[in-house]
C-alpha cells in the first residue's frame, strides 16, 4: 500500500464516562499528521537467557498540522471562550479530551481505496505561534498542535477502516464523531 493523500481532520467532543462523541467538525485542512505510539517494554531473564519479552501500548504522541485552526477548535479542544469572530484565552483554561479522526487515500495493487482512522481519546495542547514578514517570496505559516492519544478503559485507542469511496470514509468519520442526520 502507498498513501497518497490526507484530508478531513475531524474533531468531536468526548463525554466521559459514557465515551460518546458529539458536535464533530473539520479542523481546517490537513497538511500533515504524525502518530507515534509509545510502548512499555520488559524482559525477563532466567537461566542466563531472555525467557520472556512483553511490549504493551502506553499512549501515542500526535502532531497535527492544518491550514487553519478554526475558532470552534479553541473552545472544544482547549477550553477557551469563543464568539463568532474572537477567542479569549485565560490562564485557567484547560484542554479537553476529544475524539480525532482523518482519512487518507491509498493505492493497493493499483486500486484507490480510502482509509479512515479514529483515535478514541486525545488531548491536544496549543503549539508555538510563529509569524514572519512576507518578504520577496510568499511563505505560508500554518498552525501545528501536539497531543497524546490514550486508550479508553476497555483498551481501545484507535480504529482503522478501509472504504471503496471517499464519501463512505467521510460518513464513517461523521458517525464516529456522533453526527446525527437531521
Predicted features along the sequence, with ranges:
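Structured, beta-strand-rich domain cores
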Residues: 52-118
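Short secondary-structure transition/capping segments
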Residues: 9-11, 110-112, 145-149
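Hydrophobic transmembrane signal anchors and adjacent membrane-proximal interface regions, especially
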Residues: 4, 9-12, 51, 89, ...
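Mixed-charge, glycine-accented linear interaction segment located at domain edges/termini
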Residues: 122-182
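Repeat-unit-sized solenoid/scaffold elements
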Residues: 3, 77-80, 91-105, 132-143, ...
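Solvent-exposed edge beta-strands and adjacent loop segments
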Residues: 1-76, 123-139
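Short amphipathic beta-strand/extended segments with alternating polar/hydrophobic composition
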Residues: 22-26, 114-121, 159-163
Amino acid at each position: 500500500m502507498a498513501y497518497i493523500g490526507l484530508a478531513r481532520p475531524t474533531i468531536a467532543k468526548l463525554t466521559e464516562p459514557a465515551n460518546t462523541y458529539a458536535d464533530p467538525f473539520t479542523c481546517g485542512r490537513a497538511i500533515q499528521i504524525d502518530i507515534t505510539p509509545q510502548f512499555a517494554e520488559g524482559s525477563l531473564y532466567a537461566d542466563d537467557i531472555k525467557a520472556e519479552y512483553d511490549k504493551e501500548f502506553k499512549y501515542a504522541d500526535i502532531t497535527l498540522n492544518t491550514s487553519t485552526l478554526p475558532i470552534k477548535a479553541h473552545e472544544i479542544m482547549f477550553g477557551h471562550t469563543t464568539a463568532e469572530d474572537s477567542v479569549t484565552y485565560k490562564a485557567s483554561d484547560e484542554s479537553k479530551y476529544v475524539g480525532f479522526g482523518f482519512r487518507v487515500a491509498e493505492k493497493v495493487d493499483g486500486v484507490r481505496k480510502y482509509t479512515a482512522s479514529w483515535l478514541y481519546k486525545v488531548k491536544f495542547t496549543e503549539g508555538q505561534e510563529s509569524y514572519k514578514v512576507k518578504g520577496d517570496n510568499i511563505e505560508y505559516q500554518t498552525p501545528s498542535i501536539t497531543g497524546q492519544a490514550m486508550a479508553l478503559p476497555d483498551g481501545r485507542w484507535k480504529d482503522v477502516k478501509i472504504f471503496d469511496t471517499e464519501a463512505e470514509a467521510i460518513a464513517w468519520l461523521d458517525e464516529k464523531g456522533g453526527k446525527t442526520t437531521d
